[in-house]
Amino acid sequence: MVNITPLLSENVKKHFITLPASHQKEWVSYINEAKKEETRLKRVLKMQVSFCEKYTLEGEPQVINLLEEIININSQEGNALAEAFISAIGNNHSGVYCVTYKWAIAFLVQLYQNSEPSSLRAIAIYGILNDFYYFEPIEEQAANADNTTIKEEIKQLLAPFADKN
């Protein structure tokens, strides 16, 4: 069973927890009824798209679409998708990424763990996560106490993708 909360953006999570418990259970059942992990992850993305449309959430649909493309990656688009994803949540030239996209990083880690090790998808995801390990996490708005904890959690998520391992 997939715990979906780490894979949800903060905006979606905020709206999700306001739903009645029966609606939350419906979404979780819909996600978990899929037999394959990849299908479950696709359903998590579909749920987020639904919430983005319903609550008019900005910025996230682009990241969600890129994650869906990474699930279905082919050889011609691997590098371009990796660059597009890095640019969507950070800046490759500055070596930074925004902590508000912790959910997207957690999603990629989950997807990597459920990919064949030598597949194009696994190789592309490993490259993205390896880059992020060496990037500096930044906040979109003023720093707050929670972001220090979030930065540490992200570093722990990314540690297996560092070159030293």
Residue locations for each model-derived region?
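HEAT-repeat alpha-solenoid elements in large eukaryotic scaffold proteins
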Residues: 75-89
